[in-house]
Amino acid sequence: EEKIRLTIGTSKSPNNIYVYDMGSKELKKLTETLNPEINANDLVAAEVVRYPSFDGLEIPAINYKPLDASKRNKVPALVWVHGGPGGQSRTGYSSLIQYLVNHGYAILAVNNRGSSGYGKTFFKMDDLNHGDKDLKDCIWGKKWLQAQDYIDAENIGIIGGSYGGYMTMAAMTFTPDEFKVGVNIFGVTNWLRTLKS
């Protein structure tokens, strides 16, 4: 083999296909997957952050700050909860997150306890208590957002799909005063029916 085919993407760019020629050491881009109507300069880079939860456990998260957000121009925010429950939010490109950020919302994609990618102990920390400690991790993510000087601390919601949608509904049900709004994207709301299917 003289050539390697690979995909490369970032939080600001969907994956593209490249070919690397090992002889000439040339990297050639074969695709351009970003819609040409989207200005790449409008997209925001993901920033990995960590914050302490209610019990001191360090929670990893990915922060997306709108370009025009500042101390003088505070923006509303959403706590983003991934599916799973053993899924993981990563720094790769998300068209929905970029859309929300470009419409003025800061996003904190929380990797609450039970998320994959942080070892077996972290992964098993939400076993037998879904919607409890993992939800508290999301609430403490909200507290982290409130401490940022560019966030409108009174306007923070929660959003998620699949298990993240369940967490959204758990937040709205068990802690109704924590979040201003909840957006359930195809989340589980009937565990008995889900477990039977």
Residue spans for each PLM region:
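Serine-hydrolase catalytic core recognition
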Residues: 2-197
